[in-house]
C-alpha cells in the first residue's frame, strides 16, 4: 500500500514538473513540428533548453526521497557530480544535477551544464550518417576504400597491405564489423605510442593516422565478426566530411542537432583550460595515477586531462553537452510520435532493428525488441554516460563527471539501480 502511494505521489510530482516546464518542451517541439513545414531549421527561432532547465524546478520536499536515494548511490561510487534526466513519451519529467560541477570553485551541478558524452557520441555520428543517406549522398553498402571508394585518396590506397580493406562498407563501420581489432590497444587513443613507433614530432591528424593504421592487417574478414572500434567511428567522421563538404562538427550541428532542438552540443577540448562555457570539471577516481601526456611531451598528467586528444576522437567519443539536451536528441530519433523525428521512420527502424547473436545496432549498443531497453553507454577518463530507452516510453539518462574504479562496468550497476528506481517510483 505504501509503495502504491509513493508511486502515485511521484507520478503527481512528475506531472507537475512536466506542466511547469511544459512551455520549454512545447517550444522545442514546435521548432520541429511547425505547421509551416516549408520553413528550414535555420529560419525557426532557437529555443535553448540549457537556458531553461535548472535544479530550481525540482526543489522541495516532494522530491527529497528519490533525490536522497540517488545521492546515496552517487556517494557510494564517489561521484563528484552527475546529471539525471528522465522522460516519458518524449516529455521531460525529471532533470536534476547532483553534487559538484567544479568542487574547487564551489560550483554546484545543474542539469543544463555540459559534460563529455564519451561513446554516446557514436549515436550522434550514426544519426549524421543516416541523414547523409536520406540526402542521397551515401548508401549503406558503399565501399570505404579503393579507387571507387569514399576515401579514395591514393595515399590511403598505397598504404593498404591487406586486400580485405577494399571490402569494408559503411554499414560494417557502423556495426563494428569492419575487421578492426584492439589487440595492440585502441589505435585512436594510442597517440603517444603511434608517434614513437613512426618517429612523429607532432600528433597525427586523421589522414596521417589513417595512413599509418591502414598498413596493419585486419583482425578478421569484414562482415564475419565484430569488435567494438573507435577507429571505425573516426573513419565515419571522415566520411561525413568527405560527403558533406563540411567540417564534421558543423555538419552534425546544422543537420542533426539543431533540427532536434539541441543548440549547445560541441566537440569537447582536451584540457581544463579548453572547457566550453558552462562545462564541468572532470575527476579521476581515488587511487588513479598520472599518465604520460598523449603528445609524447614526457609530461605526466591527470588521465582525464591529457591522456587522450579529445578532438581527434571526433565522432567516436568527443561530443559534450547536457543530459537535458541529450534527452531531446533521443526524442528526435526514437520513432515515437510525440516529437517529430529528424530521421525518417525507415532510418529509425534500420538503426534500431534487433540484431542476431548480440551484434551491435546502428549507433546504439543494443536495441532489443523484448521488454528490455535500448542501451547506449559511454566511458572516458573522468566521465561516464548511460542512456536507457524503455519499451514503456521512459528514457533515463545519467552522465557523471567522475571516473570509477570499475570503468565502463559502472554502467551495468547503474542499469540495475535504474530498475530499482523505476519499480519504486515510476
Go through the PLM ranges and name each one.
Residues 58, 62, 66, 113, ...:
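Residue-level signature of the cytosolic catalytic core of signaling kinases
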Residues 76-83, 105-172, 220-231, 314, ...:
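Short active-site loop at a secondary-structure junction
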Residues 62, 66, 117, 121, ...:
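Hydrophobic (often cysteine-bearing) scaffold residues that line and stabilize catalytic clefts
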Residues 14-22:
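Hydrophobic membrane-insertion alpha-helices, especially the h-region
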Residues 2, 22-96, 253-254, 295-426:
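Catalytic loop of the DD-peptidase/beta-lactamase superfamily, centered on the K-T-G motif
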Residues 2-15:
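N-terminal Sec-pathway targeting helices
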Residues 158-373:
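Short, surface-exposed loop or secondary-structure junction motifs
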Residues 95, 107, 181-184:
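Short, solvent-exposed loop/turn elements at domain surfaces
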Amino acid at each position: 500500500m505504501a509503495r502504491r502511494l509513493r508511486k502515485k505521489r511521484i507520478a503527481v510530482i512528475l506531472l507537475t514538473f512536466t506542466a511547469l516546464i511544459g512551455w520549454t518542451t512545447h517550444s522545442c517541439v514546435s521548432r520541429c513540428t511547425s505547421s509551416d513545414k516549408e520553413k528550414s531549421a535555420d529560419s525557426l527561432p532557437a529555443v535553448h533548453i540549457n537556458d531553461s532547465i535548472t535544479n530550481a524546478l525540482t526543489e522541495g520536499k516532494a522530491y527529497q526521497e528519490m533525490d536522497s536515494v540517488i545521492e546515496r548511490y552517487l556517494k557510494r561510487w564517489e561521484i563528484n557530480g552527475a546529471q539525471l534526466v528522465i522522460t516519458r513519451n518524449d516529455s521531460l519529467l525529471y532533470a536534476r544535477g547532483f553534487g559538484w560541477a567544479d568542487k574547487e570553485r564551489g560550483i554546484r551541478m545543474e542539469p543544463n551544464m555540459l559534460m563529455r558524452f564519451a561513446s554516446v557520441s557514436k549515436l550522434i555520428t550514426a544519426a549524421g550518417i543516416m541523414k547523409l543517406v536520406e540526402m542521397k549522398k551515401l548508401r549503406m553498402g558503399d565501399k570505404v576504400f579503393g579507387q571507387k571508394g569514399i576515401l579514395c585518396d591514393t595515399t590511403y590506397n598505397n598504404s593498404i597491405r591487406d586486400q580485405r580493406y577494399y571490402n569494408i562498407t559503411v554499414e560494417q563501420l557502423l556495426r563494428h564489423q569492419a575487421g578492426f581489432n584492439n589487440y595492440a590497444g585502441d589505435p585512436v587513443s594510442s597517440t603517444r605510442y603511434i608517434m614513437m613507433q613512426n618517429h612523429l614530432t607532432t600528433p597525427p591528424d586523421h589522414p596521417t593516422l589513417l595512413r599509418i593504421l591502414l598498413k596493419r592487417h585486419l583482425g578478421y574478414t569484414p562482415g564475419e565478426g565484430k569488435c567494438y572500434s573507435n577507429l571505425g567511428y573516426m573513419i565515419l567522421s571522415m566520411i561525413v566530411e568527405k560527403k558533406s563538404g563540411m567540417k564534421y562538427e558543423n555538419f552534425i550541428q546544422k543537420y542533426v542537432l539543431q533540427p532536434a532542438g539541441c543548440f549547445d552540443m560541441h566537440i569537447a577540448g582536451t584540457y581544463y583550460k579548453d572547457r566550453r562555457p558552462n562545462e564541468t570539471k572532470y575527476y579521476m577516481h581515488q587511487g588513479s595515477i598520472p599518465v604520460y601526456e598523449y603528445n609524447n611531451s614526457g609530461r605526466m598528467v591527470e588521465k582525464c586531462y591529457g591522456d587522450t586528444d579529445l578532438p581527434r576522437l571526433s565522432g567516436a567519443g568527443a561530443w559534450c553537452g547536457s543530459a537535458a539536451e541529450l534527452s531531446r536528441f533521443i526524442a528526435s530519433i526514437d520513432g515515437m510520435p510525440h516529437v517529430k523525428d529528424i530521421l525518417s521512420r525507415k532510418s529509425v527502424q534500420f538503426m534500431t532493428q534487433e540484431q542476431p547473436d548480440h551484434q551491435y545496432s546502428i549507433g546504439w549498443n543494443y536495441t532489443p525488441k523484448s521488454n528490455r531497453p535500448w542501451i547506449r553507454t559511454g566511458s572516458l577518463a573522468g566521465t561516464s554516460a548511460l542512456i536507457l530507452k524503455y519499451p514503456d516510453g521512459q528514457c533515463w539518462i545519467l552522465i557523471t563527471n567522475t571516473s570509477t574504479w570499475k570503468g565502463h562496468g559502472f554502467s551495468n550497476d547503474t542499469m540495475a539501480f535504474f530498475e530499482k528506481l523505476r519499480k519504486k517510483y515510476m
